[in-house]
Regions:
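Conserved residues at the C-terminal ends of beta-strands
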Residues: 34-37, 55, 95, 133, ...
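Active-site-proximal beta-strand elements of phosphoester/diester hydrolases
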Residues: 2-11, 93-95, 124-134
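Charged helix-capping and loop-helix junction motifs
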Residues: 112-113, 142-149
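Short hydrophobic/aromatic-enriched beta-strand-loop microsegments
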Residues: 8, 50-56, 184-188
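Structured beta-strand-rich core segments of catalytic domains in phosphoester-bond hydrolases
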Residues: 36-124, 228-230
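Short, flexible loop segments at the rims of nucleotide/cofactor-binding pockets, characterized by
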Residues: 7-12, 105-109, 138-142
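Active-site beta-strand/loop signature of hydrolases that rely on acidic residues for catalysis
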Residues: 5-9, 19-45, 84, 127-130, ...
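Metal-dependent phosphoester-hydrolase catalytic domains
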Residues: 156-161, 168-244
Length: 244
């Protein structure tokens, strides 16, 4: 089944004026989103993406970029990951990765959400998406390593799948290397998935920070015909894949 898939970290409410028209224009078969407020799903779905799955990973009222001094507001709004599609979606799995945290903890600082994983069937394809564990400098720590093992164990039952999302794990570092040894990495030629202007680290010096942290992996049985990245939509670039 030919399929167009988009993965995008939308950074909460910051870029909805760009994200909504982008998704409407793209008319993808499947959209995997990270950092989504549940209350914004009707707007994001527009009239094209009639089906969705959502997994909350945080209670928060305010976004969380410490570097731009916004402060922290735990709040009660549900914030997490989502899959949108005009195709029927069958949820196969929705799980959090940190058994030591409440399923939906309150925002108490950067990286304090409970990382999540959704696995769903869209048409003939099994699609998994995650907003993976954050570390301050993108270096793997013990918690991130533990969560990776949990994620891989959760994916074991699916012999054929697409895995995408914001992994908070730069290409070439330990977490990415482990994933790339198990799956086919389809973004080896991508220069960065951090927007050169909209990401907080690039706002004063465009293009200063270049990291590939948004990845698309598949099992070897799936053919990806083309991968592109699109900036100017959010603080992360949109990863757009055309699958055979």
């Amino acid at each position: 089944m030919a399929l167009k898939l988009i993965s995008l970290n939308i950074e909460g409410k910051r870029h909805l004026d760009k994200v909504v028209p982008f998704l409407t224009e793209q008319k993808a078969d499947v959209v995997c989103l990270q950092e989504v407020f549940e209350e914004d799903l009707p707007k994001l779905k527009d009239q094209f993406y009639s089906n969705h799955l959502f997994l909350p990973t945080w209670h928060t009222n305010q976004h969380f970029n410490l570097e731009i001094k916004e402060g922290y507001s735990p709040g009660e709004k549900l914030f997490g990951i989502a899959i949108l599609s005009p195709l029927p979606l069958t949820e196969l799995l929705a799980s959090h990765l940190d058994p030591k945290l409440p399923e939906i903890p309150k925002n108490s600082g950067p990286g304090t959400w409970n990382p999540g994983l959704i696995v769903a069937k869209a048409g003939d394809l099994t699609i998994a998406t995650t907003h993976f564990t954050w570390t301050r400098f993108g270096q793997a720590d013990e918690r991130q390593q533990q969560h990776l093992q949990i994620l891989l164990n959760l994916l074991d039952p699916y012999p054929e799948l697409i895995l995408t999302g914001d992994f908070n794990a730069p290409r070439g570092e330990e977490i990415h290397a482990t994933l790339a040894s198990r799956f086919v990495d389809h973004t080896p030629d991508v220069d960065t998935t951090l927007d050169p202007k909209l990401h907080y680290a690039n706002r004063n010096e465009p293009g200063k920070l270049k990291l590939v942290v948004d990845h698309l992996f598949t099992t070897s049985t799936i053919t990806v015909e083309e991968i592109t990245v699109k900036n100017g939509v959010s603080d992360h670039c949109a990863v757009i894949a055309h699958l055979a």
